[in-house]
């Protein structure tokens, strides 16, 4: 079964109405062999905050070393976001395999008049995949209520009810007491039910669940078992929180703003302790600080401040208002869209005073008509109200009217927030087609449905080709406009709204110029897509020189004017001052040997020297911070005056800070900013930072990682890391991306990454390729350990495919390879250099 067929089948199940209860999903799970029976589950229910709490539990358990599944809803761009293992989305191949196995049973049940719903089936998908992935524990966000929710097909080892308010009253009941009763049913058999409820809801939960562990505010609820305090914002991304029990006090930071998130953090810590009683404080600190949760008071930019929040009921809107009070701004400009079944009057009434409003509608049938939403504001609030259409266009208008000291808030629905967020996350990936097979593979990966259409369009895909994901209504416009100027556009076979669809655009540069000019028409809400196409294909725009909507400049202009990667491929020389690094471990452990090697690299033409004090080879032990600083800082200080940039290869922010103090220019983090302090260090010091895609560091050779398409999957995951870094205050011009060859990829996948290096230009950042002497070369018959010839060949390929930096051990040979690759494209640059020397 092809992926688009599987996804279309799942979304077609949305036509079936919700029937509360677990009998249907239990039967499906039985048909699948009861995959849930071998997995430990944590269940998180609540009217608000259950998704944030589930994410915090997931992050802490992963930091403790557990293999963790996470199931949440709804999704933003891709249904696979709902099901994750260790932070990675379920592969397309696994989703397709599940649907192929479950479809006959689901069709039979529908024929009998007992169809399963979309949510029931996707919940079964999650439980099936968690078993297949062999997770240690899985965290489930309850969909609605508790007792009759599909997630209650499992017997949890730990559970929570975050809070209770009026919601889904037609199903759950008309009172807080009734709703609390159904939520209390998630209580585990052998552990207290953790809850942040108060008043009547808490009384009902105590009566229903019996054994309860309460979490409350330290001031108001001094009798709570776990007491939390909210210390307010410490920067524009993080808040200080204290979690206190009779046994310990934890002062932590969380990347989720708002006093209510402090209570969620207390609940999450309690759940993590129940699952892993021996979890240490460091895992709790790092887990909470890495618990990023998109669309929950997510600050996307400054000047003006832009905030995305998926608040979709009155209580959540009131919470947004309290968090906004922590920010200083002049006027508030609102982008508002919501579902038709929500209490719009109460939601609008809970929001703070606004200067202007643009209403909008997400690309989903449940979305409320923007005219109706406008009338609500006109009656209740009285600001300047504009009736909009598409979310992207509404966001553009709000940002255009906001001054630098104002705030733009997108609120009302996670579906609306999801569409707005693509302004920052959408990637336009350039494709190089050397053969018809290359073109066919691009169309296959984009899930173009019809085989004949794939074959026909492959023959046309011989000019410039890019691949991106947009809303279906935007895909229709792209196709019509590109066809009208003589280009071609293939669209994936996804048939249902609310899910982004793949588009593959092919044409000459002239055709793309005409397309992007047409897309500037405001009704299309595609100006952002046009800007990204121009940037990817290096097309001059009428407003050339301005940054795109994400604030990213052209990749070729990324960084300071003097950075060597702005003038062709730069060579980074590896200087390991360790006793055990692979290939050169121990050779430069002595400081005098290290300095001598650095000088030799400079003489050979190196552009950057990368100093590392900890090995990431398989089985390497972690080096304490003090020892790593002792190794790298003196070497960096000794070579800082050389005519070369110096980077430090470390995954620890404390080591990075010491290295910068010693004279380093660049931070090279092989864990992709896993240390939450690293991104703030880079922002504060203004240092470029290399962000690598890695699964494990040190490398775990036994770890098997599933990719559908390793290049596009890595681009997808790096997109969020780049956005995370930008939100911390690092300008995109200071971000360098590393696909992470050798880190959680097979040998064949490493070669795929090398051969398609140019596609990483979609991220708008310089690209680093690190392939030196790696075991990947055994795929082509090279002996492990010393692969100089293969490394040099790889360097030439990387330079030819657009790498901005290559990281290597052997500088002279690789400088020569880079020069040959550059000369093959632009020999005149070398003639000019020779004339200057003469």
From Swiss-Prot:
Pathway(s) it belongs to: Cofactor biosynthesis; tetrahydrofolylpolyglutamate biosynthesis; Cofactor biosynthesis; tetrahydrofolate biosynthesis; 7,8-dihydrofolate from 2-amino-4-hydroxy-6-hydroxymethyl-7,8-dihydropteridine diphosphate and 4-aminobenzoate: step 1/2
Coiled coil: none
Catalytic activity: (6S)-5,6,7,8-tetrahydrofolyl-(gamma-L-Glu)(n) + L-glutamate + ATP = (6S)-5,6,7,8-tetrahydrofolyl-(gamma-L-Glu)(n+1) + ADP + phosphate + H(+); (7,8-dihydropterin-6-yl)methyl diphosphate + 4-aminobenzoate = 7,8-dihydropteroate + diphosphate
Molecular function GO labels: ATP binding; dihydropteroate synthase activity; metal ion binding; tetrahydrofolylpolyglutamate synthase activity
Transmembrane portions of the chain: none
InterPro entries the UniProt entry points to: DHP_synth-like, DHP_synth_dom, Dihydropteroate_synth-like_sf, Folylpolyglutamate_synth, Mur-like_cat_sf, Mur_ligase_C, Mur_ligase_C_dom_sf, Mur_ligase_cen
Binding sites annotated in the UniProt record for Mg(2+): 576
Pfam families per record: Mur_ligase_C (PF02875), Mur_ligase_M (PF08245), Pterin_bind (PF00809)
EC number(s) from the headed UniProt entry: 6.3.2.17, 2.5.1.15
UniProt name for this protein: Probable bifunctional folylpolyglutamate synthase/dihydropteroate synthase
Gene that this polypeptide is encoded by: folCP
